[in-house]
Amino acid sequence: MGNVPGKIDQEDSFNDVRPDSSYNTTSSNSVIKQYDEEASSRVRTRRTTSLVNNILNGNNARTKTGSHLSSTSRRKTSREKELAKEAHAKQLVVRCSETVDGGFLAPFGCYSFEKLDYDATVVKNLIIKRKLAPFYTPLQDFDESWTRDELIKIVDGLPLHDTFDENLEEFEDVPIGNLRKSTFNELIDKSLSKKEQRRMHAKIFRARLYKKRILWQENENETFLERKLEMKRIGSKSSNVEDNTSSQPRKNYHLPSDDLKYTLYKNGSECPICFLYFPGPFNYSKCCQQPICTECFVQIKRADPHFPHDEVDPTEPQTNDSEKDPNLLTSEPANCPYCATASFSITYQPPTNRETGIGGMPADSYVYKDAAISRADGGQPNIPAITSDTIRPDWEIKLNKERARLMRRSANATAIHISNRLIDPSHSTRRNTSHSITPIHDESTSASRSPEPTINELEDQMVREAIRLSLEDQDNRKKSKNRNTSLRP
């Protein structure tokens, strides 16, 4: 029966306090009533404590049940997240075979990898459909006095991607092991605590991913250089020897011709944000018609989930974020970096004189045409506007996840607070003892004292909280299921 006193225990307790024959009957009944109240209080406390534990551990119980059925489920989920990050990193590798109008589908590397958290598949599709300017290889500077040959020579020396810092201080002394192996548990110090082991696992994974990105890009760089050398050899042979195989289909190396190189960079301009020189045409802000390169545009995104910035009244106490309603969390659209207009968006009108690469002619077959470069006009209704939400369609999912996390934390804090009031060992004992010692209360004192909630009232409050949490959990699962269904192609 646990800690609840049984009938025999109660009788023994009564025998211990049983008075002699001179002890009056009223006093004996008072002692018996006191023991009954204490026993009943202990039963309620244990029952309510169990209810609190059910509320605190309700979601964990479902997770543990699934883990009991499949011991690898949590590891699989963690591994899936790591594989998704690796797949995203592979999408950011610049490939010489993936070009559109002289640009590429992946960024040159003007910004750090951590800031490239956009949906790479969405961005690539926008570039291929020519709704967004491609990622161009930038020039640090440009001189209008450069001749055609000088400009082509400079462009020939441009790399496919910016250089990596192979000795980052962040990953100094971090083991990476064999990158060909998918697991690296042997690199983790098992003498550390579970929390420290998880931190070490995450750090090793980041270091390994960084090294993999370098290797992936270096492989593409080698392919890029090999194709350059091969095209140069073919060009020198054709200029010295008459080509009798001109009727045979030529191999597409996906490299720009000299005419395309000249066309690209002679009509370029400087991005006002990163101050690098890019070929045109640029993306243009829809609100104030200012140019912005794609490298900079993909950095712009919504603010992280936060509570509204209310005006602070110095006469009133400030409310902590943990006490606020999680449903008040918000995330405003990005503002224009030039004029601060809300809901920043850009438009892009592709060039009409150099449709090369994917969806166009081979880049090495382009012949120079002296035609004006198209410029986007935000006033034209047929030009689609692209926002930061377009390239980060999961912003609402992240906002709802943060709201759910705060709801769970708030519910846990409420349950713990009520639990502490219920299982306080001195709470019911002091109250019951005071009743037995002072059976007659001063009515004026009781009236002035604020009424304490009874055990039954607190139990009812816990039941309502449990029902509310259950309904919220069911509603969140239903919304998540509907959202996943709508996102399927």
Curated annotation (Swiss-Prot):
Residues recorded as bearing Phosphoserine in the entry: 13, 436
Regions of compositional bias (Polar residues) in chain numbering: 21-32, 57-69
Chain residue ranges for the region called Disordered: 1-44, 57-84, 419-489
Keywords: Cytoplasm, Phosphoprotein
GO terms for cellular component: cytoplasm
Composition bias type Basic and acidic residues, residue spans: 461-477
Source superkingdom: Eukaryota
Compartments it resides in: Cytoplasm
Modification Phosphothreonine occurs at: 183, 433, 438
InterPro entries for the chain: Sip5/DA2
Cross-referenced PANTHER family: PROTEIN SIP5
Function, in words: May negatively regulate the SNF1 kinase by promoting the interaction of the REG1/GLC7 phosphatase complex with the kinase. Deletion of SIP5 promotes resistance to artemisinin, which is probably an indirect effect of an action on the electron transport chain.
The protein's assembly and partners: Interacts with SNF1 and REG1.
UniProt similarity note: Belongs to the SIP5 family.
Name recorded for this polypeptide: Protein SIP5
Taxonomic source organism: Saccharomyces cerevisiae (strain YJM789) (Baker's yeast)
Name of the encoding gene: SIP5
